[in-house]
Amino acid sequence: VISAEIMQVHHQKHHATYVNNLNAAEEQLAEAIHKQDVTKMIALQSAIKFNGGGHINHSIFWNNLCPSGGGEPTGPLAEAITRDFGSFEAFKEKMTAATVAVQGSGWGWLGLDPTSKKLRIVACPNQDPLEGTTGLKPLLGIDV
């Protein structure tokens, strides 16, 4: 259970800051492109990755939430979890292990490998977005 206060801080402060900082970096990037200032373009990459990743990750996170909890998945997702991890319990254990292993801040992800069509559990540091850094399609993200 996540408190309403934590969710408000996350949404109104953290996520809003990522969006505002991303917008500012994009404006600076547009100016650097217009001026053909390659040094400035390169310097902005880390701000775009961090703040863009924070926006992407939190947008996925909000879409994953359910008012009374999600319970166990059903249908094709449940079948894929059983196929790739053995059981829902085994999936939860592996997801927990990967997520608690994150040092500092980061994300634990359940992602779909578009080539093999298999589910994978991956941890990403900081605000690195899953798809942009691994190519996996994000299905479930846990903010650490």
UniProtKB/Swiss-Prot annotation:
A GO CC term assigned to this protein in UniProt: mitochondrion
Cofactor note text: Binds 1 Mn(2+) ion per subunit.
Swiss-Prot/TrEMBL keywords: Manganese, Metal-binding, Mitochondrion, Oxidoreductase
Compartment(s) where it occurs, according to its Swiss-Prot or TrEMBL record: Mitochondrion matrix
Function, as annotated: Destroys superoxide anion radicals which are normally produced within the cells and which are toxic to biological systems.
Subunit and partners: Homotetramer.
Binding residues for Mn(2+): 10, 58, 143
Source organism (scientific name): Branchiostoma floridae
Family of the protein in this entry: Belongs to the iron/manganese superoxide dismutase family.
Principal location listed in the UniProt entry: mitochondrion
Domain of life: Eukaryota
Cofactors, names only: Mn(2+)
Protein name: Superoxide dismutase [Mn], mitochondrial
Listed EC numbers: 1.15.1.1
